[in-house]
Regions:
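Short glycine-enriched loops at secondary-structure junctions
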Residues: 86-91, 111-114, 142-145
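Catalytic core of membrane glycerolipid acyltransferases/transacylases, capturing the structured
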Residues: 91-109
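Non-catalytic terminal/interface segments that mediate subunit docking, oligomerization
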Residues: 39, 83-86, 96-97
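Divalent-metal-activated hydrolytic enzyme cores
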Residues: 1-77, 102-103, 112-121, 125-134, ...
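Residues in well-ordered beta-strands of folded domains
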Residues: 85, 109, 239
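Glycine/small-residue-rich phosphate/adenosyl-binding loop
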Residues: 79-81
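Well-ordered alpha/beta subsegment
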Residues: 135-139
Length: 310
């Protein structure tokens, strides 16, 4: 029976350490290319196209990275090339979706990818203790985020924030996301009009936009942390993983087809004013067909101004 395989491969005849990206740009390309491979694999599995049966997608791994061939008691050196700050959601397999293997990524996962003290402390550890290898920091949001959805629902129905189903520690996460939700709501009002909240699809659009703005705000904060630490060689990027097409991108279009050009990581904002631009751009992209002419829909993605690497 033919299968469509996603394989972690080690070649014992070539057991040397694999090369790591030499700089931030190479690190970004490695992550994006890995996601293109993963998204293609997922699409092939979904469609079960007979022409793709037997296809094999390979992530090269070195056993040396996890201690093979070392004397007993010796530990392998930790040398990730990227720090990824993502959500705890089990549907977002970080190494897999970026096509990376052992010792490639230093991953910090917390609901809503919010930057609390413990999270920031972990990032500072990576920037200092692992400075020889770390080339970039990535904030990874995802569509369908439960933490952002909870924040949006509390924003729309404030009494939910104080309900027994929303315990105190969970409220601290919700509070950190409220700023992104308010920015998203302002973007929708600007794009969809003052009665945006009454337009069908408003809640889902508010969630999707808040996910993007939340990731952008975290990336902005981390850019400041990197600058304060004078780690000029480290680039801060961000993107959103779609559970629909399995692509990481920014801006993110839930309706976008699986295509190499639809994968990209954006540079962290350099100014808080960029948050409103992101929210408005996403609102334009998600505007219902009944609220815009066809020509505007066709150009929605092209007109976004979110800074992405070229």
């Amino acid at each position: 029976m033919s299968t469509i395989d996603y394989i972690y491969r080690f070649d014992p005849k070539n057991s040397s350490l694999k090369s790591s990206p030499p700089d931030a740009e190479a690190a970004r390309k490695s992550l994006e290319n890995g996601n293109r491979m993963f998204a293609k694999w997922m699409e092939n599995c979904r469609t079960s196209d007979i022409s793709t049966e037997g296809a094999c997608y390979v992530v090269e791994c070195s056993g040396v990275e996890v201690g093979m061939n070392r004397a007993q008691g010796q530990l392998p050196k930790q040398a990730p090339f990227a720090v990824v700050v993502g959500c705890s959601d089990a549907r977002v397999p970080t190494e897999l979706l970026f096509g990376q293997g052992f010792n490639d990524l230093f991953i910090i996962r917390v609901a809503g990818n919010v930057l609390g003290d413990v999270c920031l402390g972990s990032i500072e550890f990576a920037m200092n203790a692992l400075s020889e290898s770390v080339k970039c920091i990535v904030v990874l949001g995802h569509l369908g985020c439960g933490a952002v959805t909870g924040a949006v629902d509390s924003y729309l129905q404030p009494l939910k924030f104080w309900s027994k189903s929303n315990p105190p520690m969970l409220r601290t996460i919700t509070q950190r996301i409220f700023v992104a939700v308010r920015e998203a709501a302002n973007g929708l009002k600007e794009s969809w009009g003052p009665d945006a909240h009454s337009v069908p699809g408003y809640r889902q659009a508010l969630i999707d936009i808040a996910v993007c703005v939340n990731a952008a705000q975290a990336a902005f904060e981390l850019r400041l942390e990197v600058e304060r630490a004078a780690k000029w060689e480290i680039e801060v990027l961000y993107g959103v993983f779609s559970l629909l097409n399995h692509q990481v991108s920014m801006p993110v279009n839930p309706r976008a087809p699986v295509h190499p050009d639809n994968v990209n990581l954006a540079y962290a904002p350099t100014n808080p004013r960029e948050f409103s631009t992101i929210a408005s751009s996403m609102a334009d992209l998600l505007k219902p067909a009944s609220h815009e002419p066809a020509s505007s829909r066709e150009n929605a993605t092209a007109n976004t101004t979110i800074p992405s690497p070229k």
